[in-house]
Every structure is written in C-alpha cells, then in structure tokens.
Amino acid sequence: MAKYEILYIIRPNIEEEAKNALVARFDSILTDNGATVVESKDWEKRRLAYEIQDFREGIYHVVNVEANDATALNEFDRLSKINGDILRHMIVKLDA
C-alpha cells in the first residue's frame, strides 16, 4: 500500500460541530473508496500567506492515508474542490 499525506485548509469561521462533521465526512469518503485512514488530526489555526476567498486565516487539518490505488484520492480531490468549507487542499505521496 502506498502512503499519502493530505493537508487541507478549512475556513476559519466554521462552527466546531460543522468542522467535526466536515472532517468525518471527508475521512469516510476516503475509507468508503478503499483507503485506510492512519491518522486524522487538526494541526492548528494559522495565518495564510495571502488571502484565499477573503480569509486571512485557516484551520489546517492533516490526514495520513494508505491506499492501493488512486480511487479514494481522486474522489477526495473532486469533492474537496467543490466544497465551500475547504479553501485549499494538497495530496502528497510519501516515500516508502
């Protein structure tokens, strides 16, 4: 299984319950499509280098994933692009 790290930035004015639901939803998207979530944690609320959608801060969330193929990652990528609560995301394949 290949190991991946996903980092996404959540808008800072989201309520705690909505943020937890968003994280749970995107973790389940990964697991429903065949990936294994090793770790999913909030990093911290940080100032952004530049404004994204009129926000100067964002809540960083990191997910470590193991997957056999890119199906789960492609679905995560597709859905995170159309979700208004996620400002940016990045998927990186980790070295073995």
Curated annotation (Swiss-Prot):
Function: Binds together with bS18 to 16S ribosomal RNA.
Keywords: Ribonucleoprotein, Ribosomal protein, RNA-binding, rRNA-binding
Family of this protein: Belongs to the bacterial ribosomal protein bS6 family.
CC terms in the record's Gene Ontology section: cytoplasm; ribonucleoprotein complex; ribosome
UniProt GO molecular function: small ribosomal subunit rRNA binding; structural constituent of ribosome
Organism in which the protein naturally occurs: Streptococcus thermophilus (strain ATCC BAA-491 / LMD-9)
A single BP term in Gene Ontology: translation
Name assigned to this protein: Small ribosomal subunit protein bS6
Disulfide bonds: none
Matching Pfam families: Ribosomal_S6
NCBIfam families according to UniProt: S6
Signal peptide (from-to): none
